[in-house]
C-alpha cells in the first residue's frame, strides 16, 4: 500500500508534497528510462523526417505550394499511369528482386488486378486504351505504327480524352504517344488533349531525346503541344522530366475542377539508361542488362511516389482514381522478366499479354483486395467515361466493359472473353491450314482468343520459352538462361486452360477438339467484324532532315487541281455555249400573253 499523500487525487500540493523517500530511487530509474525512450524515438524517426524533408524540397524546387484539400467536384480526378515494357514479375509484390516500394504500397492499399490483359506491343495497347476497341476494329491489327508510315489512329474514332472533355474535364497527356503523327490532325492535341508534353515515338535516348529509326533517319523527338520542345534539349532524364511536368500541371490546376492525366512513361523501354544513383542497390546483379533495367524501374517507382505526393499536396488525392498498367510484357533480352509466365513482349503467350496492373483510390469500397476477374485494357474507356458521368453514343460499338463495380465492390466481371488479336498479314506458320482448323479457320493466321478459362492460339504465337530472371546469369548481355520447349512439328493450334495452367505448360488441343472448334468459330465471328488492315509503306517525306531535324507531321494534302487538257477545255467550251443558247431560248419563250403582267 502506498504511503499516505502519494496516492489518490488530492488538491494541488506543494512541489514536495509527493516526493516520498521510498520512491526516490525508482523515480530516478524511471527518468533515465524516459530519456532513453526519447533518444530512441528521435533516432527511429530520423529516417522518416529526412524522407519528408526531401519530398518537401522536391516540391519546392518545382515551384509548388501547399493548398487545402477540397473535393467540391462530384466527378473524380482520373490519373492513368502507363509503364512501358514492364514485365509481369518486375514488381515487388510479384516476388521481384527489384525494389518497388511505391508500387507495392499503392497496390496493397488498392486493388491488385491479377487477371489483367493488354496487347503484346506498344501501339495496339495504347490504341485500345484510348478507343475502347480491339485493334481489328481500328485497322491496327498488324505490328506498330512506324515513324516513317503515313498512318495514325483513325480520325473517325472518338477518343477517351474527347469524351471526357464533353463533361467538363481538363485533359493532359505527358509521355509517349506512339499513335501516329504523319498529319497534324493525328497529334495528341487534335485527339482530345488540352496539353501534350512528350515524345511521338517513345523509344529514343532518355537524355538527348533523339531517335533513329534507321541509318540516316534520325531526329529530335520531344514535343510541347504541337511544336518541338527545343528548350528541353538539356540532358534531363525523361522519367524525371515527365514527373516535373505532371507536378507543374497539378500545381496550376484548380482541384475543384475535374482533371484527366494520362502519364505514359518511356521507362522501362530500351535503351537501358538510368541516373547513376539508382544503381546503388543492384551491384549484386551480375547481368548488366538486368542491372540497368532494375535501376530504371527504381527511378520510375520514385517518380510515381512524387506524382502521388503532388496529388495529396494540391488537394486532388481524396477524390482521385489512380490506375497503373504496363503496356505489354517484358523483354528478357533488355532486362525484363515475365517469370513464371511463358513468352515475352511481342508474343501472344501469357508473358507477352498478362500485365502488372492495379487501382488505387480513396473511392474504392473494397481496399486491400485482389481482383481475379477477367479485365482487359479496352475496359478503361467505358469505365472512366462512366465514372466521369459521361455518355457513350449508342451507335458506337465498343469492345470494353464498365468494370468499376468489379474492381471496387468485388462483383463478377461482365467480361467472359478477350480477342487478343487476329493478324491476317502475319501468316508465318508453315504448317497452318484450313484443314488444321477443321475447315473453320486458317490456322496459318496468327490469332489468339480467351473464352472464360480457355485460351486458343493459332499460327505462330511468337517466342515461346520460359525465361527465369537473369539477375545472377553471367552469360553476357546478349545471352540468357531459359527453359526451352520444342514445338511439335506441324503444330499450328494450341489450347490451354489458363485457370488451371497459367504457365501454358500442357497443350490440350488434341484432348478437347470440341472446345477447339468452338473457339475457332468464335474467332471466325470476330473476323467478320474486322476492318481492313492499315499498314502503308514508308514515305520518304517523313525523314526528319526534311523537317528541321524533328520527327513530326510531314504529310500535306494535294490541293492543286490539275489543268484540264486541250480536249477537256474544248468540251467545256462547247457545253457552256449550249447552256447559253438554252438560256436565250428560255428568255425569248417567256413572253406573257392575254394581257397578264409578268411579275
UniProtKB/Swiss-Prot annotation:
- CDD domains documented for this protein: 4-S
* Cofactor binding note: Binds 1 Ca(2+) ion per subunit.
User: Which cofactor(s) are needed, names only?
Assistant: Ca(2+)
Q: Which organism is it from?
A: Homo sapiens (Human)
The secretion signal range is 1-49
User: Active-site residues?
Assistant: 122 (nucleophile), 178
Residues holding Ca(2+): 84-85, 122, 327-328
Q: Which family does it belong to?
A: Belongs to the sulfatase family.
PROSITE patterns, A to Z: SULFATASE_1, SULFATASE_2
Q: Does the keyword Transmembrane helix apply?
A: no
Q: Where is this region: Disordered?
A: 531-599
**Localization of this protein:** Secreted
Q: What name has this protein been given in UniProt?
A: Arylsulfatase J
Amino acid at each position: 500500500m502506498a504511503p499516505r499523500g502519494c496516492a489518490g487525487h488530492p488538491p494541488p500540493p506543494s512541489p514536495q508534497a509527493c516526493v516520498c523517500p521510498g520512491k526516490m530511487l525508482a523515480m530516478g530509474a524511471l527518468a533515465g528510462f524516459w530519456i532513453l525512450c526519447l533518444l530512441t524515438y528521435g533516432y527511429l524517426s530520423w529516417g522518416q523526417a529526412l524522407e519528408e524533408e526531401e519530398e518537401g524540397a522536391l516540391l519546392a524546387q518545382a515551384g509548388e505550394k501547399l493548398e487545402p484539400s477540397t473535393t467540391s467536384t462530384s466527378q473524380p480526378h482520373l490519373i492513368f499511369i502507363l509503364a512501358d515494357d514492364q514485365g509481369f514479375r518486375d514488381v515487388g509484390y510479384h516476388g521481384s528482386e527489384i525494389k518497388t516500394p511505391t508500387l507495392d504500397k499503392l497496390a496493397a492499399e488498392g486493388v491488385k488486378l491479377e487477371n489483367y490483359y493488354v496487347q503484346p506491343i506498344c501501339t495496339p495497347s495504347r490504341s485500345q486504351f484510348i478507343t475502347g476497341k480491339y485493334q481489328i476494329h481500328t485497322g491496327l491489327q498488324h505490328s506498330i505504327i512506324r515513324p516513317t508510315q503515313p498512318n495514325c489512329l483513325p480520325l473517325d474514332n472518338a477518343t477517351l480524352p474527347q469524351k471526357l472533355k464533353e463533361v467538363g474535364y481538363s485533359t493532359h497527356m505527358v509521355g509517349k504517344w506512339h499513335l501516329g503523327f504523319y498529319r497534324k490532325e493525328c497529334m495528341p492535341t487534335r485527339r482530345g488533349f488540352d496539353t501534350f508534353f512528350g515524345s511521338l515515338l517513345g523509344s529514343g535516348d532518355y537524355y538527348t531525346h533523339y531517335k533513329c529509326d534507321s541509318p540516316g533517319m534520325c531526329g529530335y523527338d520531344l514535343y510541347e503541344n504541337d511544336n518541338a520542345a527545343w528548350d528541353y534539349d538539356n540532358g534531363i532524364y525523361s522519367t524525371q522530366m515527365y514527373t516535373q511536368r505532371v507536378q507543374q500541371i497539378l500545381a496550376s490546376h484548380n482541384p475543384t475542377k475535374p482533371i484527366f492525366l494520362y502519364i505514359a512513361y518511356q521507362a522501362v523501354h530500351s535503351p537501358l539508361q538510368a541516373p547513376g544513383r539508382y544503381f546503388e542497390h543492384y551491384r549484386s546483379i551480375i547481368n548488366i542488362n538486368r542491372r540497368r533495367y532494375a535501376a530504371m524501374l527504381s527511378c520510375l517507382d520514385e517518380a510515381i511516389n512524387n506524382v502521388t505526393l503532388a496529388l495529396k499536396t494540391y488537394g486532388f488525392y481524396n477524390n482521385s482514381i489512380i490506375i497503373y498498367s504496363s503496356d505489354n510484357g517484358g523483354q528478357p533480352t533488355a532486362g525484363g522478366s515475365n517469370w513464371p509466365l511463358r513468352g515475352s513482349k511481342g508474343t501472344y503467350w501469357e508473358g507477352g499479354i498478362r500485365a502488372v496492373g492495379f487501382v488505387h483510390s480513396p473511392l474504392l469500397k473494397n481496399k486491400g483486395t485482389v481482383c481475379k476477374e477477367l479485365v482487359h485494357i479496352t475496359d478503361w474507356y467505358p469505365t472512366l467515361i462512366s465514372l466521369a458521368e459521361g455518355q457513350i453514343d449508342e451507335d458506337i460499338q465498343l469492345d470494353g466493359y464498365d468494370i468499376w463495380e468489379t474492381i471496387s465492390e468485388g462483383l463478377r466481371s461482365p467480361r467472359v472473353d478477350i480477342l487478343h488479336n487476329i493478324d491476317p498479314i502475319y501468316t508465318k506458320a508453315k504448317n497452318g491450314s484450313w484443314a488444321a482448323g477443321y475447315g473453320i479457320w486458317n490456322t496459318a493466321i496468327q490469332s489468339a482468343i480467351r473464352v472464360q478459362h480457355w485460351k486458343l492460339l493459332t499460327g505462330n504465337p511468337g517466342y515461346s520459352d520460359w525465361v527465369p530472371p537473369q539477375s545472377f546469369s553471367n552469360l553476357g548481355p546478349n545471352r540468357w538462361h531459359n527453359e526451352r520447349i520444342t514445338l511439335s512439328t506441324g503444330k499450328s493450334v494450341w489450347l490451354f486452360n489458363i485457370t488451371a495452367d497459367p504457365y501454358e505448360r500442357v497443350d490440350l488441343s488434341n484432348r478437347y477438339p470440341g472446345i477447339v472448334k468452338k473457339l475457332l468459330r468464335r474467332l471466325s465471328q470476330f473476323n467478320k467484324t474486322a476492318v481492313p488492315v492499315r499498314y502503308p509503306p514508308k514515305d520518304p517525306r517523313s525523314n526528319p532532315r526534311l523537317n528541321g531535324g524533328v520527327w513530326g507531321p510531314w504529310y500535306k494534302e494535294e490541293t492543286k487541281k490539275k489543268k484540264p487538257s486541250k480536249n477537256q477545255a474544248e468540251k467545256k467550251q462547247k457545253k457552256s455555249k449550249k447552256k447559253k443558247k438554252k438560256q436565250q431560248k428560255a428568255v425569248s419563250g417567256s413572253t406573257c400573253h392575254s394581257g397578264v403582267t409578268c411579275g
